[in-house]
Amino acid sequence: MKVTGFSFIRNAVNNDYPVVQAILSILPVCDEFVIAVGDCTDNTLELIEGIGSSKIKIIHTVWDESIREGGRTFAQETDKAYAAISKDTDWAFYIQGDECVHENYLPVIKNAMEENLNNENVEGLLFKYLHFYGSYDFIASSRRWYRNEVRVLKFDPGVHSYRDAQGFRKNGRKIKVKPIEAYIYHYGWVQPPAGLGNKVRNFNKFYHEDSWIQEHLPENIEFDYGNADRLIRFEGTHPQVMQKRIEVSNWKFQVDPTLMKKKMSLRRRILQKIEDMSQWRIGEYKNYKTVQ
C-alpha cells in the first residue's frame, strides 16, 4: 500500500501558515509527499526545503491571480499537486497549509486505509474537524463552521479539487467516503489581530476585486474576533509538531467567549440547540456521499 501526501502553498512566511508542521504531521504515514510551491515573495521555498526529507517532492507553480471568483485558484493549485503524484499511489492524503493531524490519529488513519484498500465502495475517508480560533485554547463550534471534510482519497485520474479546494469530485460527482474517528486540527484562525487581518486580506484577493478589498479590508486592518458565534475551551492536547509554535505565541486573546453566543440570532440559537441535542445539523452542506 503506497500513500502519497499532497498540498500547495505560497507565501507561508508572510501569511504565517504552519505549513512545515502540516507536512510533518502526516509524513510518518506517507511514502512520498508532493508540495506545489507557488511564486512566493518570501522564503517559503527555503522553509519547505529545510524539512530535509527524501519523501518530499517539490513542484514549482505560478498562481493565476486573474481569477477573482470563488477561490478557484486554490483548486487549480491543488490539482497541480495531485497531478504530480506517482501513478502507483494507492491513497492520496491531502493536507492544507494551516491544518495538522495529531499523532494519536495516525494509526487510526493507516488502519482505515488498509481495511478499505480493496473496498470499491469506499473512495475516500471523511475526517472530523477542530477549528481553533483566536487562541490555541479555544475552538469555534457552531453552524458557521464545517464539521467534516474529505482528506484521504483513493488515487484516481478522475479526481479533481472542487470549488475553492474545500473538497473533491470524481468525474464530476461527489466522492463516496467512509467516516473515521480522526480529526483535522485547523489553525487558520489562530494569529494575532494584525497578522490575521493581513492574512484575510490576502486570502480574499482570490474571491473579490480590488475595489471590494479596499472598501471592506483596508490595509493595516485588525481582525475582529467577535464573529465566531460560539467558542468552546479546548481541553485536549495539540500535535507534537505544533508544540514549539504554541510555546512562542505572544499575544493575548481578549475576547469574552460568553458574549459571542449572545450575538447569535434567535433562529441560529434554535438551530444550534437542535444540533447540540440531536447531532443533526439542519440544511448542512455535504460535499461528499457517506457510505459504511
What do the PLM-derived regions correspond to, one by one?
Residues 28, 51-53, 87, 119-120, ...:
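Short, well-ordered coil/turn elements that cap or connect secondary structure elements
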Residues 96-100:
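The conserved acidic donor/metal-binding loop of glycosyltransferases
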